[in-house]
Protein backbone atom coordinates (compact mmCIF):
# COMPACT_ATOMS: atom_id res chain seq x y z
CA UNK A 1 0.00 0.00 0.00
CA UNK A 2 1.38 3.42 -1.00
CA UNK A 3 2.55 5.91 1.62
CA UNK A 4 3.90 9.45 1.50
CA UNK A 5 7.30 10.23 2.99
CA UNK A 6 7.71 13.91 3.79
CA UNK A 7 10.73 15.81 5.08
CA UNK A 8 9.33 18.98 6.61
CA UNK A 9 10.66 22.48 6.98
CA UNK A 10 10.96 23.58 3.34
CA UNK A 11 9.38 26.75 1.99
CA UNK A 12 7.37 26.51 -1.22
CA UNK A 13 8.13 28.52 -4.34
CA UNK A 14 7.00 28.27 -7.97
CA UNK A 15 3.80 27.44 -9.86
CA UNK A 16 1.11 24.76 -9.49
CA UNK A 17 -1.58 23.97 -12.09
CA UNK A 18 -5.02 23.39 -10.56
CA UNK A 19 -7.04 20.42 -11.85
CA UNK A 20 -10.75 20.17 -12.61
CA UNK A 21 -13.13 19.87 -9.67
CA UNK A 22 -13.79 16.36 -8.42
CA UNK A 23 -17.18 17.36 -7.02
CA UNK A 24 -18.23 18.78 -10.39
CA UNK A 25 -16.73 16.03 -12.56
CA UNK A 26 -18.60 13.18 -10.84
CA UNK A 27 -22.19 14.45 -11.39
CA UNK A 28 -21.23 15.77 -14.84
CA UNK A 29 -20.01 12.30 -15.88
CA UNK A 30 -23.29 10.82 -14.60
CA UNK A 31 -25.19 13.35 -16.73
CA UNK A 32 -23.93 11.39 -19.75
CA UNK A 33 -26.65 8.85 -18.88
CA UNK A 34 -29.35 11.40 -19.76
CA UNK A 35 -28.79 11.36 -23.54
CA UNK A 36 -28.07 8.95 -26.39
CA UNK A 37 -25.87 11.62 -27.96
CA UNK A 38 -22.17 12.34 -27.41
CA UNK A 39 -21.02 14.55 -24.53
CA UNK A 40 -17.45 15.87 -24.77
CA UNK A 41 -15.79 16.93 -21.53
CA UNK A 42 -12.45 18.59 -20.80
CA UNK A 43 -10.54 19.52 -17.63
CA UNK A 44 -11.61 16.21 -16.06
CA UNK A 45 -9.23 15.47 -13.14
CA UNK A 46 -7.13 12.30 -13.00
CA UNK A 47 -8.52 10.87 -9.74
CA UNK A 48 -9.42 7.50 -8.30
CA UNK A 49 -13.04 8.61 -7.84
CA UNK A 50 -13.24 9.54 -11.54
CA UNK A 51 -11.80 6.14 -12.48
CA UNK A 52 -14.39 4.45 -10.25
CA UNK A 53 -17.39 6.34 -11.68
CA UNK A 54 -16.22 5.70 -15.26
CA UNK A 55 -15.91 1.99 -14.49
CA UNK A 56 -19.48 2.01 -13.15
CA UNK A 57 -20.82 3.91 -16.17
CA UNK A 58 -19.06 1.59 -18.61
CA UNK A 59 -20.54 -1.39 -16.79
CA UNK A 60 -23.97 0.07 -17.57
CA UNK A 61 -23.15 0.28 -21.27
CA UNK A 62 -22.14 3.94 -21.47
CA UNK A 63 -19.21 4.36 -23.84
CA UNK A 64 -16.47 6.46 -22.24
CA UNK A 65 -13.17 7.28 -23.94
CA UNK A 66 -10.54 9.01 -21.83
CA UNK A 67 -7.48 10.87 -23.14
CA UNK A 68 -5.65 12.94 -20.56
CA UNK A 69 -8.11 15.45 -19.13
CA UNK A 70 -10.63 14.81 -21.92
CA UNK A 71 -13.51 12.33 -21.71
CA UNK A 72 -15.99 11.55 -24.50
CA UNK A 73 -19.25 9.91 -23.40
CA UNK A 74 -21.92 8.23 -25.50
CA UNK A 75 -25.07 6.82 -23.92
CA UNK A 76 -26.71 5.22 -26.97
CA UNK A 77 -26.07 1.63 -25.86
CA UNK A 78 -26.92 1.60 -22.14
CA UNK A 79 -28.30 -1.84 -21.31
CA UNK A 80 -27.89 -2.22 -17.55
CA UNK A 81 -29.86 -0.07 -15.11
CA UNK A 82 -28.09 -1.21 -11.95
CA UNK A 83 -25.24 0.08 -9.81
CA UNK A 84 -24.04 -2.93 -7.79
CA UNK A 85 -22.72 -2.84 -4.23
CA UNK A 86 -19.18 -3.77 -5.33
CA UNK A 87 -18.99 -0.52 -7.31
CA UNK A 88 -20.95 1.80 -5.02
CA UNK A 89 -19.39 0.78 -1.70
CA UNK A 90 -16.14 2.63 -2.41
CA UNK A 91 -17.75 5.95 -3.35
CA UNK A 92 -21.06 7.42 -2.29
CA UNK A 93 -21.19 9.70 -5.37
CA UNK A 94 -22.32 6.59 -7.27
CA UNK A 95 -25.82 7.45 -6.01
CA UNK A 96 -25.79 10.14 -8.73
CA UNK A 97 -26.74 7.56 -11.37
CA UNK A 98 -30.16 7.13 -9.71
CA UNK A 99 -31.84 10.28 -11.03
CA UNK A 100 -30.57 10.08 -14.63
CA UNK A 101 -31.39 6.37 -15.03
CA UNK A 102 -34.89 6.79 -13.60
CA UNK A 103 -35.62 9.87 -15.71
CA UNK A 104 -34.46 8.41 -19.03
CA UNK A 105 -35.25 4.71 -18.67
CA UNK A 106 -38.01 4.63 -16.05
CA UNK A 107 -36.13 2.35 -13.71
CA UNK A 108 -32.97 2.21 -11.59
CA UNK A 109 -31.49 -0.15 -9.02
CA UNK A 110 -28.69 1.38 -6.99
CA UNK A 111 -26.93 0.01 -3.94
CA UNK A 112 -27.01 2.17 -0.84
CA UNK A 113 -23.75 4.12 -0.95
CA UNK A 114 -20.46 3.80 0.90
CA UNK A 115 -17.55 6.22 0.58
CA UNK A 116 -16.15 8.34 3.39
CA UNK A 117 -16.16 7.42 7.05
CA UNK A 118 -16.97 10.99 8.06
CA UNK A 119 -20.66 10.55 8.74
CA UNK A 120 -23.88 8.86 7.74
CA UNK A 121 -24.83 11.33 4.95
CA UNK A 122 -28.20 9.66 4.31
CA UNK A 123 -29.84 9.58 0.89
CA UNK A 124 -33.38 10.01 2.19
CA UNK A 125 -33.71 13.45 0.56
CA UNK A 126 -32.98 11.91 -2.86
CA UNK A 127 -35.64 9.26 -2.31
CA UNK A 128 -38.30 11.65 -0.95
CA UNK A 129 -37.78 13.98 -3.90
CA UNK A 130 -38.11 11.21 -6.48
CA UNK A 131 -41.22 9.89 -4.72
CA UNK A 132 -42.72 13.39 -4.90
CA UNK A 133 -42.13 13.21 -8.67
CA UNK A 134 -44.17 10.02 -8.84
CA UNK A 135 -41.52 7.32 -8.53
CA UNK A 136 -42.20 4.09 -6.68
CA UNK A 137 -39.19 3.52 -4.46
CA UNK A 138 -38.43 0.45 -2.38
CA UNK A 139 -35.35 -0.37 -0.33
CA UNK A 140 -34.61 -4.05 -0.11
CA UNK A 141 -31.45 -6.07 0.59
CA UNK A 142 -29.34 -2.91 0.61
CA UNK A 143 -30.60 -1.62 -2.76
CA UNK A 144 -32.73 1.35 -3.77
CA UNK A 145 -35.13 0.18 -6.49
CA UNK A 146 -36.98 3.02 -8.23
CA UNK A 147 -39.59 2.85 -11.00
CA UNK A 148 -41.61 5.48 -12.85
CA UNK A 149 -43.21 5.36 -16.29
CA UNK A 150 -42.68 9.12 -16.49
CA UNK A 151 -41.54 11.42 -13.71
CA UNK A 152 -43.92 14.32 -13.05
CA UNK A 153 -42.82 17.84 -12.25
CA UNK A 154 -43.63 19.07 -8.75
CA UNK A 155 -42.44 21.38 -5.98
CA UNK A 156 -39.79 19.81 -3.74
CA UNK A 157 -38.57 21.35 -0.49
CA UNK A 158 -35.69 19.36 0.98
CA UNK A 159 -35.45 19.12 4.78
CA UNK A 160 -31.79 20.04 4.61
CA UNK A 161 -29.36 21.42 2.05
CA UNK A 162 -27.88 18.47 0.18
CA UNK A 163 -25.44 18.81 -2.71
CA UNK A 164 -25.80 15.33 -4.20
CA UNK A 165 -29.54 15.41 -3.49
CA UNK A 166 -29.89 18.65 -5.44
CA UNK A 167 -27.82 17.22 -8.30
CA UNK A 168 -29.78 13.97 -8.49
CA UNK A 169 -33.17 15.70 -8.45
CA UNK A 170 -31.98 18.37 -10.91
CA UNK A 171 -30.90 15.72 -13.43
CA UNK A 172 -34.14 13.77 -12.95
CA UNK A 173 -36.25 16.91 -13.42
CA UNK A 174 -34.71 17.77 -16.81
CA UNK A 175 -36.63 14.89 -18.43
CA UNK A 176 -39.74 15.02 -16.21
CA UNK A 177 -43.19 15.93 -17.46
CA UNK A 178 -43.89 19.57 -16.59
CA UNK A 179 -42.31 22.00 -14.13
CA UNK A 180 -40.20 21.03 -11.14
CA UNK A 181 -39.26 23.56 -8.46
CA UNK A 182 -36.37 22.66 -6.14
CA UNK A 183 -36.51 24.77 -2.97
CA UNK A 184 -33.62 24.87 -0.48
CA UNK A 185 -31.32 23.75 -3.29
CA UNK A 186 -27.56 23.61 -2.76
CA UNK A 187 -25.78 26.65 -4.23
CA UNK A 188 -22.29 25.15 -4.50
CA UNK A 189 -20.32 26.10 -7.64
CA UNK A 190 -20.19 22.42 -8.59
CA UNK A 191 -24.02 22.31 -8.72
CA UNK A 192 -23.93 25.41 -10.92
CA UNK A 193 -21.38 23.73 -13.21
CA UNK A 194 -23.64 20.69 -13.60
CA UNK A 195 -26.62 22.95 -14.34
CA UNK A 196 -24.63 24.80 -17.01
CA UNK A 197 -23.81 21.50 -18.73
CA UNK A 198 -27.46 20.43 -18.58
CA UNK A 199 -28.52 23.72 -20.20
CA UNK A 200 -25.93 23.12 -22.94
CA UNK A 201 -27.61 19.72 -23.44
CA UNK A 202 -30.99 21.38 -23.94
CA UNK A 203 -32.39 21.48 -20.40
CA UNK A 204 -34.52 24.45 -19.32
CA UNK A 205 -33.33 25.62 -15.90
CA UNK A 206 -33.90 28.96 -14.18
CA UNK A 207 -32.36 30.20 -10.94
CA UNK A 208 -28.92 28.66 -11.50
CA UNK A 209 -26.64 29.61 -8.59
CA UNK A 210 -29.57 30.28 -6.23
CA UNK A 211 -31.40 28.11 -3.70
CA UNK A 212 -34.49 27.92 -5.92
CA UNK A 213 -34.15 26.01 -9.18
CA UNK A 214 -37.05 25.94 -11.66
CA UNK A 215 -36.82 23.20 -14.29
CA UNK A 216 -39.13 22.79 -17.28
CA UNK A 217 -38.89 19.17 -18.37
CA UNK A 218 -38.04 18.44 -22.02
CA UNK A 219 -38.61 15.34 -24.17
CA UNK A 220 -34.93 14.64 -24.73
CA UNK A 221 -31.48 16.05 -24.11
CA UNK A 222 -28.78 16.24 -26.78
CA UNK A 223 -24.98 16.17 -26.81
CA UNK A 224 -22.79 19.03 -25.65
CA UNK A 225 -19.21 20.17 -25.03
CA UNK A 226 -18.21 21.33 -21.56
CA UNK A 227 -15.09 22.15 -19.51
CA UNK A 228 -15.23 21.18 -15.83
CA UNK A 229 -14.61 24.10 -13.46
CA UNK A 230 -11.38 24.38 -11.46
CA UNK A 231 -11.28 22.59 -8.12
CA UNK A 232 -11.76 25.20 -5.39
CA UNK A 233 -10.92 22.69 -2.64
CA UNK A 234 -7.62 21.72 -4.27
CA UNK A 235 -6.90 25.41 -4.77
CA UNK A 236 -7.59 26.22 -1.11
CA UNK A 237 -5.50 23.22 -0.01
CA UNK A 238 -2.40 24.54 -1.79
CA UNK A 239 -3.08 28.09 -0.60
CA UNK A 240 -3.26 26.74 2.94
CA UNK A 241 0.00 24.81 2.50
CA UNK A 242 1.85 27.99 1.47
CA UNK A 243 0.32 29.95 4.36
CA UNK A 244 1.41 27.20 6.78
CA UNK A 245 5.04 26.67 5.72
CA UNK A 246 5.78 29.99 4.02
CA UNK A 247 6.79 30.81 0.47
CA UNK A 248 5.60 32.33 -2.78
CA UNK A 249 3.44 30.18 -5.08
CA UNK A 250 1.24 31.04 -8.06
CA UNK A 251 -1.71 28.76 -8.76
CA UNK A 252 -2.66 28.52 -12.45
CA UNK A 253 -6.02 27.52 -13.99
CA UNK A 254 -7.67 28.64 -10.74
CA UNK A 255 -11.07 30.25 -10.12
CA UNK A 256 -11.14 33.17 -7.70
CA UNK A 257 -14.90 33.77 -7.67
CA UNK A 258 -15.63 30.63 -5.62
CA UNK A 259 -13.05 31.22 -2.87
CA UNK A 260 -14.13 34.38 -1.04
CA UNK A 261 -14.21 32.75 2.39
CA UNK A 262 -10.78 31.12 1.92
CA UNK A 263 -9.32 34.47 0.79
CA UNK A 264 -10.76 36.20 3.86
CA UNK A 265 -9.39 33.64 6.33
CA UNK A 266 -5.95 33.40 4.73
CA UNK A 267 -5.59 37.18 4.72
CA UNK A 268 -6.64 37.15 8.37
CA UNK A 269 -3.84 34.61 8.93
CA UNK A 270 -1.34 37.01 7.37
CA UNK A 271 -1.02 35.76 3.79
CA UNK A 272 -0.61 38.23 0.93
CA UNK A 273 -2.96 37.25 -1.90
CA UNK A 274 -3.12 38.67 -5.41
CA UNK A 275 -5.14 37.26 -8.30
CA UNK A 276 -6.24 37.57 -11.91
CA UNK A 277 -8.89 35.86 -14.01
CA UNK A 278 -7.31 32.41 -13.78
CA UNK A 279 -4.44 32.71 -11.29
CA UNK A 280 -3.84 33.27 -7.59
CA UNK A 281 -0.52 34.21 -6.01
CA UNK A 282 0.04 33.33 -2.34
CA UNK A 283 2.92 34.93 -0.42
CA UNK A 284 3.69 34.17 3.22
CA UNK A 285 6.79 35.43 5.00
CA UNK A 286 5.83 35.03 8.66
CA UNK A 287 4.22 32.60 11.07
CA UNK A 288 0.46 32.44 10.41
CA UNK A 289 -2.00 33.96 12.88
CA UNK A 290 -4.71 31.66 14.26
CA UNK A 291 -8.13 31.94 12.58
CA UNK A 292 -11.44 30.66 13.93
CA UNK A 293 -14.32 29.57 11.70
CA UNK A 294 -17.51 27.57 11.50
CA UNK A 295 -18.28 25.25 8.59
CA UNK A 296 -21.55 25.75 6.75
CA UNK A 297 -23.09 25.43 3.30
CA UNK A 298 -21.88 27.54 0.36
CA UNK A 299 -21.14 30.44 0.30
CA UNK A 300 -19.99 29.83 3.89
CA UNK A 301 -16.82 28.06 5.00
CA UNK A 302 -16.72 24.59 3.34
CA UNK A 303 -16.44 21.50 5.49
CA UNK A 304 -14.05 20.19 2.82
CA UNK A 305 -11.52 22.90 3.80
CA UNK A 306 -11.84 22.47 7.57
CA UNK A 307 -9.02 19.98 8.14
CA UNK A 308 -6.51 21.89 5.98
CA UNK A 309 -7.08 25.17 7.83
CA UNK A 310 -6.84 23.30 11.12
CA UNK A 311 -3.37 22.11 10.07
CA UNK A 312 -2.37 25.75 9.58
CA UNK A 313 -3.81 26.65 12.98
CA UNK A 314 -1.66 23.96 14.61
CA UNK A 315 1.48 26.05 14.04
CA UNK A 316 -0.20 29.46 14.12
CA UNK A 317 0.33 32.22 16.63
CA UNK A 318 -2.54 32.13 19.13
CA UNK A 319 -5.59 29.95 19.75
CA UNK A 320 -8.53 29.19 17.48
CA UNK A 321 -11.89 27.47 17.57
CA UNK A 322 -13.23 25.38 14.68
CA UNK A 323 -16.92 24.46 14.74
CA UNK A 324 -18.04 21.64 12.40
CA UNK A 325 -21.76 21.83 11.57
CA UNK A 326 -22.03 19.68 8.44
CA UNK A 327 -20.76 16.17 9.23
CA UNK A 328 -20.27 14.18 12.40
CA UNK A 329 -16.95 12.32 12.75
CA UNK A 330 -15.07 15.00 10.84
CA UNK A 331 -12.40 15.48 13.49
CA UNK A 332 -10.70 12.12 12.92
CA UNK A 333 -7.52 13.88 11.80
CA UNK A 334 -7.14 15.52 15.22
CA UNK A 335 -5.66 12.43 16.87
CA UNK A 336 -3.09 12.11 14.08
CA UNK A 337 -2.18 15.81 14.22
CA UNK A 338 -1.67 15.53 17.97
CA UNK A 339 0.79 12.69 17.25
CA UNK A 340 2.87 15.30 15.42
CA UNK A 341 2.81 17.53 18.49
CA UNK A 342 -0.29 19.65 17.87
CA UNK A 343 -2.34 20.84 20.85
CA UNK A 344 -5.96 20.21 19.85
CA UNK A 345 -8.86 19.32 22.14
CA UNK A 346 -12.39 18.39 21.09
CA UNK A 347 -15.57 19.56 22.82
CA UNK A 348 -18.56 18.14 20.95
CA UNK A 349 -18.63 19.75 17.49
CA UNK A 350 -15.88 22.23 18.39
CA UNK A 351 -12.11 21.82 18.12
CA UNK A 352 -9.92 24.13 20.19
CA UNK A 353 -6.43 24.56 18.72
CA UNK A 354 -3.58 26.14 20.64
CA UNK A 355 -0.82 26.97 18.18
CA UNK A 356 2.56 25.40 18.97
CA UNK A 357 6.03 26.61 18.03
CA UNK A 358 6.78 23.46 16.07
CA UNK A 359 5.46 20.07 14.99
CA UNK A 360 7.73 17.02 14.92
CA UNK A 361 7.52 14.32 12.24
CA UNK A 362 6.04 10.91 13.13
CA UNK A 363 4.17 8.04 11.44
CA UNK A 364 0.50 8.97 10.91
CA UNK A 365 -2.52 7.46 9.18
CA UNK A 366 -5.02 9.13 6.84
CA UNK A 367 -8.66 8.50 7.74
CA UNK A 368 -10.51 10.25 4.89
CA UNK A 369 -9.89 12.41 1.83
CA UNK A 370 -9.55 15.88 3.34
CA UNK A 371 -7.92 14.56 6.53
CA UNK A 372 -5.15 13.10 4.38
CA UNK A 373 -4.56 16.51 2.77
CA UNK A 374 -4.38 18.15 6.18
CA UNK A 375 -1.76 15.64 7.33
CA UNK A 376 0.34 16.48 4.26
CA UNK A 377 0.22 20.18 5.21
CA UNK A 378 1.09 19.42 8.84
CA UNK A 379 3.97 17.17 7.71
CA UNK A 380 5.33 19.92 5.43
CA UNK A 381 5.51 22.18 8.49
CA UNK A 382 6.95 19.55 10.88
CA UNK A 383 10.59 19.10 11.80
CA UNK A 384 12.03 15.85 10.51
CA UNK A 385 10.34 12.99 8.69
CA UNK A 386 6.65 12.09 8.54
CA UNK A 387 5.28 8.90 6.98
CA UNK A 388 1.59 9.08 6.01
CA UNK A 389 -0.14 5.73 5.57
CA UNK A 390 -3.38 4.91 3.71
CA UNK A 391 -2.97 7.68 1.13
CA UNK A 392 -5.44 5.96 -1.17
CA UNK A 393 -7.82 8.43 0.50
CA UNK A 394 -5.75 11.27 -0.96
CA UNK A 395 -5.77 9.75 -4.45
CA UNK A 396 -9.59 9.78 -4.43
CA UNK A 397 -9.65 13.56 -4.64
CA UNK A 398 -6.22 15.00 -5.45
CA UNK A 399 -4.50 14.74 -8.82
CA UNK A 400 -0.86 13.72 -8.09
CA UNK A 401 -0.52 16.01 -5.08
CA UNK A 402 3.02 14.87 -4.29
CA UNK A 403 4.17 15.68 -7.85
CA UNK A 404 2.69 19.19 -7.69
CA UNK A 405 4.21 19.87 -4.26
CA UNK A 406 7.63 18.52 -5.28
CA UNK A 407 7.67 20.98 -8.17
CA UNK A 408 7.48 23.91 -5.73
CA UNK A 409 10.18 22.67 -3.37
CA UNK A 410 8.50 20.24 -0.98
CA UNK A 411 10.53 17.17 0.00
CA UNK A 412 7.80 14.60 -0.58
CA UNK A 413 7.80 11.21 -2.26
CA UNK A 414 5.50 8.25 -2.71
CA UNK A 415 6.85 5.00 -1.25
CA UNK A 416 5.56 1.45 -0.91
UniProtKB/Swiss-Prot annotation:
One GO CC term on file: cytoplasm
Protein name: UDP-N-acetylglucosamine 1-carboxyvinyltransferase
Pathway participation: Cell wall biogenesis; peptidoglycan biosynthesis
Cited function: Cell wall formation. Adds enolpyruvyl to UDP-N-acetylglucosamine.
Main EC class the enzyme belongs to: transferase
Originating organism: Janthinobacterium sp. (strain Marseille) (Minibacterium massiliensis)
Catalytic reaction(s) noted: phosphoenolpyruvate + UDP-N-acetyl-alpha-D-glucosamine = UDP-N-acetyl-3-O-(1-carboxyvinyl)-alpha-D-glucosamine + phosphate
Active site: 116 (proton donor)
Entry-linked Gene3D superfamilies: Enolpyruvate transferase domain
Amino acid sequence: MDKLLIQGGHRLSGEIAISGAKNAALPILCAGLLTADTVQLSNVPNLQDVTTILRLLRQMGLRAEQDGDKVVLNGSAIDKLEAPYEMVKTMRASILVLGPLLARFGEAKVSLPGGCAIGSRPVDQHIKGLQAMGAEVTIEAGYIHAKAKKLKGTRIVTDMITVTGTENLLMAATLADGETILENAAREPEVTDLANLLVAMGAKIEGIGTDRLVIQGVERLHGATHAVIADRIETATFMCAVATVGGDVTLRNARTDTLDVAFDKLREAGAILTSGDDWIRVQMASRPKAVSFRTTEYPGFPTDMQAQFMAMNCVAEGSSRVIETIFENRFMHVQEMNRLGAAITIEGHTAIINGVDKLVGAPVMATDLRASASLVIAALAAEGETLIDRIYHLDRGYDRMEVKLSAVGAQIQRVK
